[in-house]
Regions:
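ATP/nucleoside-binding phosphotransfer catalytic cores, i.e., glycine-rich phosphate-binding loops
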Residues: 2-8, 21, 33, 266-367
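Glycine-rich anion-binding loop/nest that anchors nucleotide
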Residues: 57-61, 210-216, 252-296, 317-319, ...
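Active-site beta-strand->loop->alpha-helix modules in alpha/beta enzyme cores, enriched
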Residues: 169-186, 344-653, 659, 691-692, ...
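Gly/Ser/Thr-rich active-site loops/lids in small-molecule metabolic enzymes
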Residues: 224-254, 298-311, 641
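A conserved mid-domain beta-alpha-beta active-site/ligand-binding segment of alpha/beta enzyme cores
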Residues: 666-727
Length: 775
């Protein structure tokens, strides 16, 4: 394989270090341990190429993916000739190379939303200017950029006049305009198309892109070349698909915006126009594993845009181990190398049931011997499948155990994570009166609340103030002490009106809490100041562009709305406000590159909570790196550090840690030791509590790329799919004929891992390894 695709000196160094012995994919790949190291590999290869091509043409990505590429490139350039820099260079094939000069390179912008003002911080134009032109010291004069403000339109107008609602109707390319505005819009679309052709020509006039670095989307998109893009596509104005819009929602302030925003993107043929080009796709985390496998193991196909790199002898995928886990090479290595453990038996048998579409009891010894993985099981026999069945039954039995006399502390990175992960298990725990329960959300979660939601809520708050429906503000002591009292009453009032289906009173309950939050944040002393503050916040939000970072006080207000939502969910089960803890860890800032958790700022508050609650069981999200929002992963790091610190002063030998997952990433059956049956009633409780309580999330402004709707629907589908996998092994009759009603009524399953502290900290040590290479 590699004889056709010669590796550079840098690539040889990383390939040797990776320990990968076999590459059988259609495009070569290099694998590293973690996300920061992926940045190091990419930075080293980039600087190696620049040293050989000081006047070359480069195209680099935007978003979160290049965070460590940017940091490592800057680190190496700043430390090229000192001890720190030399050590890295000599280790990774840059030892003999002189420090590259970057100011003669030509930079090509990959893509941009359209229309979007170039002055907005969430435009890619702003990003590439900040991190690449200024950050790397590239030539602004040579750069080929996409500035939406400068693209000529009909009659010399600005896009805000031509497309006043920022929506571009591409059907005007083919149909007759219906009015004068549509005539101008049609002419403008033709002018944009002309501009895109000229942009493509400018790239080709300089010989095409020599070094392309890009990420890959959940649907496999490269730049904004989504699934189905023509292999010979060029720079164009185009629509995107739902998966791409869901990913872009975070940049643009919600799916309501991203679904209506077009993009200008270079094409797949633009990327491979120069046959000598180095074309690299980077992918981190297990959530990308499926699309990475399809992109690397499928022949050239418009369904998988990244397959276009097969045209380049210098085409590569750079992956973290997580992103490569589903590759046939990785699966072969998993089964063929190292000690055979029970997990391999379980996984291979369950996968064989899926592969053959057969129930477990119908799998014959001949089937096991014919499969390339199950045939490796030691002491393979007629009883092998039965042993796996018994193992899964034991996990289900554990999920049916009734826990008593426990102090439960359920934690989540964001509001709704706990509910979406293990609500059916929690309801079992809460129905036992000897158990005490606490809930804690570790970040403020403000980025999930849209400006529109806050504006609408504040408008309604003004309405109830004007109508005398917020009586609490009339009490003499409200602005001195009253605002801190009766928070449980807000919650009870809200839920009572969920029951009575009184939408007005429900909204009024939310506004009561918003008034309390405003008094706390803005230190309001009277009713007039309250009105002024509401008007001021509405004004700030109305004058913000979608996706703009909010001022700190508005961030806090959004966070406190989410905190109220969380209190509402657990109040369904009689949990009081004082048992719902809001930690607001400081690393969560809403910036594009968030900080790492800090021992004092982020770990200490968790330790203090542990001491205060003194739990016997702690639940947490056990998501691998890069499997979804990196907040999950960072909260896990901080929690692991807190457990370790707490263990220095208390005997934690009896403490149990529950590791769960939800909508961003899911467990496979072999990865867990507890399986909890989920009834239709459990699903209804989760769906109803989500719809009634997570008010800011019901419209799914920041959806999963897997579903255009509420996260609760995604969670329910995962539970149902998990049952399907286990039913294939155990048989449907196992469930509907079971002696326990809980199992007979199950139409979904929740998976989680129950660990002691030692097992959890061993997992945490693996996590620590995955941040080696952090700068």
């Amino acid at each position: 394989m590699l004889s056709k695709y010669p590796l550079s000196e840098v690539e040889k160094s990383f390939f040797k270090e990776s320990g990968v012995e076999k590459i059988s994919t259609l495009i070569p790949y290099l694998q590293v341990d973690n996300f920061p190291k992926l940045g190091l590999l990419t930075a080293c290869r980039f600087l190696e190429w620049v040293a050989a091509n000081p006047e070359g043409v480069i195209s680099l990505p935007t978003g979160k993916s290049p965070e460590f590429f940017i940091k490592w490139t800057q680190f190496l350039l700043e430390n090229w000739d000192n001890k720190k820099g030399k050590e890295v260079r000599e280790k990774y094939g840059l030892g003999a190379i002189k420090k590259p000069v970057l100011n003669d390179l030509t930079f090509v912008q990959i893509d941009e939303f359209y229309p979007i003002s170039s002055s907005q911080k969430n435009s890619f134009y702003d990003y590439v200017n900040k991190f690449y032109i200024d950050g790397f010291g590239l030539s602004r004069e040579k750069a080929i950029l996409i500035n939406s403000d400068a693209i000529p339109l009909a009659n010399g107008l600005h896009f805000s006049k031509v497309f006043p609602d920022l929506k571009v109707d591409l059907s005007l390319r083919f149909r007759d305009p219906q009015n004068d505005l549509e005539k101008i819009q049609q002419e403008s679309i033709y002018l944009i198309d002309q501009w895109c052709g000229e942009y493509e020509q400018r790239i080709r006039d300089v010989g095409g892109i020599g070094f392309f670095l890009g990420g890959i989307g959940p649907d496999g998109h490269i730049a904004f070349n989504t699934r189905g893009s023509h292999i010979f596509s060029v720079t164009r104005l185009t629509e995107t698909n739902f998966e791409t819009q869901a990913v872009a929602a975070g940049d643009l302030g919600g799916i309501e915006v991203s679904a209506n925003r077009l993009v200008i993107t270079i094409g797949l043929d633009t990327i491979v126009y120069n046959p000598e080009a180095v074309g690299i796709i980077i992918a981190a985390g297990e959530a990308k594993a499926g699309i990475v496998k399809d992109s690397l193991e499928t022949k050239l196909s418009n369904v998988y845009p990244a397959t276009v790199l097969q045209k380049l002898k210098n085409g590569r995928f750079y992956l973290t181990k997580g992103a490569g886990v589903r590759l046939t090479d990785s699966m072969d290595a998993y089964y063929e190398k190292g000690q055979w453990i029970w997990e391999k038996t379980e996984r291979s048998v369950i996968d064989l049931c899926k592969k053959l579409g057969k129930y477990g009891h119908r799998i014959k010894l001949a089937d096991l011997k014919a499969d390339k993985y199950t045939k490796l099981i030691p002491d393979l026999s007629e009883d092998t499948v039965n042993q796996v069945i018994k193992s899964i039954e034991a996990k289900l039995a554990k999920g049916l155990e009734q826990e008593t006399d426990q102090v439960l502390l359920h934690t989540g990175p964001h509001h709704d994570d706990i509910s979406l992960g293990i609500l059916p298990h929690i309801t079992n725990q809460l129905y036992e009166p000897s158990n005490g329960a606490h809930f804690s959300v570790l970040t403020s979660g403000f980025t999930a609340v849209t400006n529109t939601f806050v504006i609408d809520t504040l408008q309604f708050t003004k309405k109830i103030l004007d109508g005398g429906k917020a009586q609490m503000v009339n009490y003499e002591d409200f602005f001195s002490v009253g605002y801190t009292l009766k928070t449980d009453k807000d919650v009870y009032h809200f839920l009572a009106n969920v029951a009575s289906e009184n939408a007005f009173e429900r909204q009024r309950g939310l506004c009561h809490r918003v008034i309390r939050a405003l008094v706390i944040i803005y230190e309001i002393k009277n009713k007039n100041q309250l009105r002024e503050t509401i008007n001021e916040v509405i004004s700030v939000l109305r004058n913000s562009y979608d996706g703009e970072k909010n001022p700190a006080k508005i961030q806090k207000l959004k966070g406190m709305i989410r905190e109220f939502e969380e209190e509402l969910v657990w109040a369904h089960f009689g949990v009081q406000v004082k048992n719902v803890h809001h930690l607001r860890l400081g690393f969560y800032t809403g910036d594009i590159f968030t900080e790492q958790p800090d021992k004092t700022r982020d770990v200490e508050p968790i330790v203090e909570m542990f001491k205060k609650v003194n739990p016997t069981k702690i639940s947490l999200t056990l998501d691998p790196e890069g499997s979804g929002p990196d907040t999950h992963y960072k909260v896990l790091q901080a929690t692991a550090a807190a457990v370790k610190k707490w263990g220095e002063e208390k005997d934690l030998s009896e403490l149990r840690i529950i590791g769960y997952r939800n909508v961003w990433f899911k467990f496979e059956p072999h990865e867990v030791n507890v399986i909890v049956p989920v009834s239709l009633g459990d699903m209804s409780v989760m769906e109803d509590s989500f719809a009634n309580c997570y008010l800011s999330q019901v419209n799914a402004s920041f959806p999963s790329y897997a579903h255009n709707g509420k996260f609760s629907t995604v969670a329910k589908r995962i539970w149902v799919n998990q049952l399907d996998a286990i039913q294939l092994l155990l048989g449907k009759n196992y469930f509907y004929l079971h002696e326990r009603a809980k199992v007979r009524s199950s139409h979904g399953l929740v998976f989680f891992r129950d660990m002691n502290v030692e097992e959890f900290l061993a997992t945490a040590r693996e996590l620590e390894k995955s941040i080696e290479g952090m700068l």
